[in-house]
Amino acid sequence: MAAHRRWLLMSFLFLEVILLEAAKILTISTLSASHYIVISRVSQVLHEGGHNVTKLLYESANIPDFRKEKPSYQVINWRPPEDQEKKFADLRHRLTEEITYGRSKHHTLLKIHQYFGDLCSQLLSRKDIMDFLKNENFDLVLLDSMDLCSLLIVEKLGKRFVSFLPFQFSYMDFGLPSAPLSYAPVYGSGLTDQMDFWGRVKNFLMFLDFSMKQREILSQYDSTIQEHFVEGSQPVLSDLLLKAELWFVNSDFALDFARPLFPNTVYVGGLLDKPVQPIPQDLENFISQFGDSGFVLVALGSIVSMIQSKEIIKEMNSAFAHLPQGVLWTCKTSHWPKDVSLAPNVKIMDWLPQTDLLAHPSIRLFVTHGGMNSVMEAVHHGVPMVGIPFFFDQPENMVRVEAKNLGVSIQLQTLKAESFALTMKKIIEDKRYKSAAMASKIIRHSHPLTPAQRLLGWIDHILQTGGAAHLKPYAFQQPWHEQYMLDVFLFLLGLMLGTLWLSVKVLVAVTRYLSIATKVKEA
């Protein structure tokens, strides 16, 4: 009986410890489908780790299968008026056209951020939502660092937060103290970590250029800040970035270039990894038709799949017809041009089980848009890639794919059936690409902890320690001239020039004195 009581007491104590450790965490997802997928996965990981999770979700038409999701945690949905959604759809379409035809896109990108700034103002004006979030008294907020509005939400709530970066960490070199530009390529530069002299010149100039563009982007939220924060306590977005307790980066060094990281930076690329399931029988039957030749998987992302032009579809379809492999292609059947006959070795579907197909033993190649989630899945399964990057982080991801010899990238503007077919055949037949993909797979799998375990472990760490002040370098508080030792350089330069000037003056005086003395002696 006594033993039973002791066991009962220990059970209650253990339950109490679990309840004490469970934190109330808010996650914020207000961007497009790929961002939504990652933040939803993060929310699920935190929930499964014993935390009470609430997700603030922007219910957008851009999020596929939204209504199919049945999360086990609380979700707060909000949606802007229909005319606002139409405005964003028009802006997105314009941006896509500019990218497709190689025109400048920065001004349209500014308009998109201006739209997001207006959208943010609407959300901050939703008293019902903001009051609910305040009353919940969350212990921590996890946000997408690309969603600048979420920084303002957190500032309104006055809560600690951790930031999830869905891109390469190089994107934050414009908001955080940057790694040396001599070997850390700037986001958007198209460079690798091995730069010659002119590469370093380009990298430096790109850093200056994008820094100015980043300021323009941040300025699109100025009116929202002025409207919702009282004068004298209006936050600066670039300063809010530095407040993050932790930075989770959706990448892995199996893909990314090695670089120094801050102690509060954790790479968790591969969060979307999940157990492989058998593929549907109709897909298995299609693949088996091609025997040892195998198949090619084509998936160009949720947004890109909706905007593929007739010309692009025609060229790709013609290229696939030249392959001995079968081709499984994620392409909306409603978008397929009526006057284009589907190649006999191609099967198109609105949706495909991408993870399960990448793990299939008969896969030979993955044709991708180069989105981080898709690239990490390919690395996880050791599948070579051909990338057709469209925008944002996709070109940068493909630079890394090429540098690691995991595949090649082709430009959308120059995509032609013949050259596209030759490129795919080259990657399939040249065993060096498959070998490099398998080597990256080994690196990716050799971590002692899974991405989910790393994320959960570090979240628990800062909850237990009351924050991550012990992990933040003083560089976050330093003015840029101190951080880059410019003041020391100028001081030493001034000291050197002063010493040189004084030495010249003394030398001139001594020379003049000796000259006069010589003349006196001669007289």
Swiss-Prot record:
Q: Give EC number(s), comma-separated.
A: 2.4.1.17
Q: In Gene Ontology terms, what is a biological process of this protein?
A: cellular response to genistein
Kindly list the residue ranges recorded as spanning the membrane.
Answer: 488-508
Main subcellular location of this protein, as a coarse class = membrane
**Membrane topology per the record?**
Single-pass type I membrane protein
Span of the signal peptide: 1-22
Which InterPro entries does the record associate with it?
Answer: UDP-glycosyltransferase, UDP_glucos_trans, UDP_glycos_trans_CS
| Catalytic activity, reaction form | glucuronate acceptor + UDP-alpha-D-glucuronate = acceptor beta-D-glucuronoside + UDP + H(+)
> A single GO molecular function, which one?
glucuronosyltransferase activity
Keyword vocabulary terms for this entry? Glycoprotein, Glycosyltransferase, Membrane, Signal, Transferase, Transmembrane, Transmembrane helix
Name the glycosylated positions: 52
Cytoplasmic side residue ranges read: 509-523
Q: Where found? A: Membrane
Q: Which residue windows are coiled coil?
A: none
Cited Pfam families: UDPGT
For the Extracellular compartment, the record's topological domain ranges are: 23-487
**Role this protein plays:** UDP-glucuronosyltransferases catalyze phase II biotransformation reactions in which lipophilic substrates are conjugated with glucuronic acid to increase water solubility and enhance excretion. They are of major importance in the conjugation and subsequent elimination of potentially toxic xenobiotics and endogenous compounds.
What PANTHER family does this protein map onto? Answer: EG:EG0003.4 PROTEIN-RELATED, UDP-GLUCURONOSYLTRANSFERASE 3A2
Please state which protein family the record places this protein in: Belongs to the UDP-glycosyltransferase family.
Q: What is this protein called?
A: UDP-glucuronosyltransferase 3A2
